[in-house]
Amino acid sequence: MDNFAMIIFGASGDLTKRKLMPALYSLYREKRLTGEYSILGIGRTVYSDDNYRSYILEELQQFVKSEEQDTALMASFVSHLYYLPMDPAKEEGYPQLRQRLVDLTGEVDPDNLLFYLATPPSLYGVVPLYLKAAGLNTPHSRIIVEKPFGYDLESARELNKTYASVFNEHQIYRIDHFLGKETAQNVLAFRFANGIFEPLWNRNYIDYVEITAVENLGIEQRGGFYETAGALRDMVQNHLIQLVALTAMEPPAVFNADNFRNEVVKVYESLTPLNEVDLNEHIVRGQYTASGNKKGYREEKGVAPDSRTDTYIAMKLGISNWRWSGVPFYIRTGKQMPTKVTEIVVHFRETPHQMFHCAGGNCPRANKLILRLQPNEGIVLKIGMKVPGAGFEVRQVTMDFSYAQLGGVPSGDAYARLIDDCIQGDPTLFTRSDAVEASWKFFDPVLRYWKDNPDAPLYGYPAGTWGPLESEAMMHEHGADWTNPCKNLTNTDQYCEL
């Protein structure tokens, strides 16, 4: 590539060392970063160029998989790193940033200039204005912004206005790393590349859909951030609703950035508005409590002792369109769950007449499709088959596919894929301004309800469990239970390894 420069705000922070630098090294290792390029780190911590390179080299040795580490390649990669000690919250440093860019690239508008905001959200509205004041919002520049993009609908609109005053929409890349995962993208391929499933992908054949994205860790030293966010802002408003869109969207006429993102927005705009019954009965929020050697949320550093921040959310959603009317989507996310997993489970309707006995008398009769996004990525279809021997009893069995069966093909790093897309100018997997606002518009009533009703239920659940019992009660209204994932896709109800 010609004269590429990347400027990372928050270059001494956790996101940079854990995700961005390993992703950039991965691109370098795969020869996706070639030719003349410079990566300039911006942060308040004081480093020289050499000190910063040494720091990043140490972090790469910790956060890059051992089988991908190459001493010579890593040394070559960090030789392209530079550092400018600067407070991005103060405008006076930006002329110095402009000059450093010119020193590195020979011009203020290199062929490909990428800004990455790996900063606290409080700086999201400040940095672009200071870039504009310094004349750095050049025609060849792009800017990547991490979630959360806004705190609610009003703040999201204000941020969109700010960015629109500095950059064109095609220069703004709002990143959601879930969409960078190969398995998330494969949901689209599974649906639209296979004629046997798409005709069944509607209200006539699907009973309900579950989407689970949970972690087996707590807030991991992020108490200050999490107190202002909670599970709904941190996960539901962006990650989970994106997975709803991938599951429910119509096929684009032509697969390109505009058409794909148009269909995502249509799903968001079709979400059935939440009424008072929904707010009271179809949303369950929880907070993990101490269990065994695991702390409760209120015992975490940076958390108020009487905090009412949600670490678990379960919701029942509806989509008011021709394809999905009447099909509930149950989504949930939580911290301190028994395992870390993200998966989509599609429950098909039962056959209209049951001809056969069910082996054991207690096996599910409906087919179930599981799309596992992480870990142990794969797909499972559960179908009924005759039990060998006399009689005609049917038992549920699995047809499964694992990405590991492809034979050493890596699933790829989500950040590497998305950064590469941004370098190439492909915004397909990034969130557009209208999608941000449509998502917040749907969830804003929930936030207002909690604000206006501070005593709205917040259920405790012991750390290491599947969440509040009340979330099971919500599923029971549909005559169903949550599918609690096992470590391996092929585990059964009789054996479930976590």
Regions found by a protein language model. Give the residues of each.
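Secretory/organelle targeting and membrane-embedding segments
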Residues: 1-145, 149-498
